[in-house]
Structures are given as C-alpha cells and as structure tokens.
Amino acid sequence: MKRTFQPSNLVRKRRHGFRSRMITVTGRAILKKRRAKGRHKLSA
C-alpha cells in the first residue's frame, strides 16, 4: 500500500495557495479569520 501523502509543491500551491484562497468567497473568509487571529503565515 502506498502512502497517502505524496508531496508536490505545485499541487500544494494550487490547492492551498494565496491566489486560490482569493478566488472563492469562503477562501477569502479563511484569510480574514487568519488575519484576525494574527497568523504569521496566511496560506501555503
């Protein structure tokens, strides 16, 4: 059985990156919450 986590920086950026967060309303809500919490890193 292969492992479930097969790291790829491209897929990581496309799925969880800042620009992908910005295109959806819920994604923007996530960024807003993370800013409010004071997260140093907003997205992947």
Swiss-Prot record:
<dbReference type="InterPro" id="IPR000271">
    <property type="entry name" value="Ribosomal_bL34"/>
</dbReference>
<dbReference type="Pfam" id="PF00468">
    <property type="entry name" value="Ribosomal_L34"/>
</dbReference>
<keyword id="KW-0687">Ribonucleoprotein</keyword>
<dbReference type="InterPro" id="IPR020939">
    <property type="entry name" value="Ribosomal_bL34_CS"/>
</dbReference>
<protein>
    <recommendedName>
        <fullName>Large ribosomal subunit protein bL34</fullName>
    </recommendedName>
</protein>
<dbReference type="GO" id="GO:0005840">
    <property type="term" value="C:ribosome"/>
</dbReference>
<dbReference type="GO" id="GO:0006412">
    <property type="term" value="P:translation"/>
</dbReference>
<keyword id="KW-0689">Ribosomal protein</keyword>
<comment type="similarity">
    <text>Belongs to the bacterial ribosomal protein bL34 family.</text>
</comment>
<dbReference type="GO" id="GO:0003735">
    <property type="term" value="F:structural constituent of ribosome"/>
</dbReference>
<dbReference type="GO" id="GO:1990904">
    <property type="term" value="C:ribonucleoprotein complex"/>
</dbReference>
